[in-house]
């Protein structure tokens, strides 16, 4: 599940730094001048003391030292036309079981939050350290106390060193880290779908920003992910074994071009029983070639990204790297992601997205999964604090499962349209938060999709055909 990436990419840290520094200067000035006027010191002494005081508080005001807090959170109600909780989520369709997301606007029934605590310090030799702790929780209950059904969890706990005094040459600007974390650069997402293009997380060690030239740099890392309690006896489905998937990563940048390569190894995972046979992969490879543009496909101001991903074996889960231990030894997947944002005049914004994947021999020999999602988010700014948001999402899928986990073969379309009056402190961009929105959504799909029975929402009670849903939601990050 995606989380919370925009607060990292689209922060207003510059403005916050200025405000912090202004407050710090004011407080320091008042304190120093008040005490020293009483002591009858000279102007020069008072200025010298003030400069020393500012030197002490300025790193904290800039955010270079001390504690800070970040968050991502969303919370809302999603109701059907009978006033009861409705099924929802970007992965509610059969294709969602293999990563096929649809639009999230007016389609999220949960409360999800991340509380991120940071502590930064600078050693006497100039080396910087950053400790981060992320605590996350998720629930679909509307109650205020959800300890029984929540999912409180520590998602990150790591330390990172930068500006290391002993690093020179190509390592002069490098950062060294260890612990449990989301990879800094392999955590970029298509926000409208709540889908990462690629996501790497786990426990390990790495080196960022090995700089070979102004335009060429690389990141290297080793992550571990646990495969727990999988069956290794054909006569039982009980979990009897476990192993670890080790992921060795090289993430390279050549200007706007990104090339990622991952190698994976999970000892004894080939003893896993999937579909009554032991043909699971114990190794794999995944690669991605991406381009990040600073315009809207060269047509107007804005931005865009295009990514082509391919994986085999354990790498056939091309998005959530190393996360799926059931993949077949011959599994192969290819995915493409295209998305961008731009303005259509002074008061309109648009963000189109295409995400598609084809895979074969994914879980059992002979299966084939194909799906494509087209999504567009549109916003019309109507005042200083109000805008109308619209989202249209269409997905087509052809899933031939060969009976994996009792799933049926399905072939069909899903479509959804949402209108969402939205309030915010200031309009002006897709990344301005917080937002408070109300919404109405209409979704429809082919009846055949109800037969998939792979844990998806379609075909469940009160959710077997065309649906209206209504609700409200807040979303915030900083």
Model features per residue range: what roles?
Residues 426-437:
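C-terminal closing repeat unit and adjoining cap/tail of repeat-based domains
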Residues 113, 153-155, 174, 201-203, ...:
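Residues that flank catalytic or metal-binding motifs in active/ligand-binding sites
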Residues 40-172, 210-213, 220, 251, ...:
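Beta-barrel outer-membrane channel/assembly domains of diderm bacteria
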Residues 215-219, 251-423, 468, 476:
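Detector for outer-membrane/organellar transmembrane beta-barrel domains
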């Amino acid at each position: 599940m995606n989380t919370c990436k925009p607060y990292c990419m689209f922060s207003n840290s510059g403005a916050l730094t200025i405000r912090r520094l202004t407050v710090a200067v004011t407080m320091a000035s008042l304190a120093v001048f008040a005490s020293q006027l009483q002591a009858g010191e000279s102007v020069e002494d008072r200025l010298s003391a003030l400069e020393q005081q500012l030197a002490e508080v300025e790193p904290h005001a800039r955010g270079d030292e001390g504690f800070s807090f970040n968050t991502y959170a969303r919370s809302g109600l999603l109701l059907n036309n009978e006033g009861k909780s409705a099924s929802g989520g970007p992965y509610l369709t059969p294709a969602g079981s293999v990563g096929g997301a649809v639009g999230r606007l007016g389609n999220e029934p949960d409360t999800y939050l991340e509380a991120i605590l940071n502590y930064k310090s600078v050693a006497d030799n100039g080396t910087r350290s950053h400790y981060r702790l992320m605590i996350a929780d998720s629930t679909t209950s509307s109650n205020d106390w959800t300890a029984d059904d929540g999912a409180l969890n520590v998602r990150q706990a790591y330390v990172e060193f930068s500006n290391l005094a002993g690093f020179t040459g190509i390592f002069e600007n490098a950062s060294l880290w260890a612990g449990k974390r989301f990879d800094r650069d392999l955590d970029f997402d298509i926000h409208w779908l709540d889908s990462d293009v690629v996501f790497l997380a786990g426990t390990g060690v790495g080196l960022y920003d090995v700089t070979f030239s102004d335009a060429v740099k690389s990141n290297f890392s080793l992550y571990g992910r646990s495969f727990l309690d999988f069956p290794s006896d054909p006569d039982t489905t009980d979990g009897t074994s476990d192993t670890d998937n080790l992921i060795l990563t090289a993430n390279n940048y050549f200007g706007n071009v990104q090339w990622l390569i991952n190698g994976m190894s999970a000892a004894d995972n080939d003893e896993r029983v999937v579909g009554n046979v032991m043909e699971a992969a114990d190794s794999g490879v995944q690669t991605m070639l991406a381009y990040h543009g600073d315009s809207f496909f060269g047509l107007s101001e804005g931005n865009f990204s295009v990514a082509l991903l391919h994986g085999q074996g354990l790498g056939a889960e091309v998005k959530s790297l190393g996360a799926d231990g059931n993949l077949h030894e011959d599994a192969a997947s290819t995915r493409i992601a295209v998305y961008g944002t731009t303005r259509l005049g002074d008061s309109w914004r648009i963000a189109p997205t295409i995400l598609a994947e084809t895979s074969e021999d994914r879980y059992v020999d002979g299966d084939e999964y194909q799906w494509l999602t087209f999504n567009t988010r549109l916003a019309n700014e109507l005042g200083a604090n109000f805008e109308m948001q619209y989202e249209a999402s269409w997905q087509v899928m052809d899933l031939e499962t060969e009976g994996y986990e009792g799933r049926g073969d399905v072939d069909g379309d899903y479509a959804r349209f949402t209108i969402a009056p939205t309030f915010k402190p200031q309009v002006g961009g897709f990344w301005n938060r917080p937002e408070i929105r109300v919404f109405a959504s209409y979704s429809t799909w082919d009846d055949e999709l109800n037969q998939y029975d792979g844990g998806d929402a379609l075909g469940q009670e009160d959710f077997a055909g065309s649906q209206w849903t209504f609700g409200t939601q807040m979303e915030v990050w900083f």
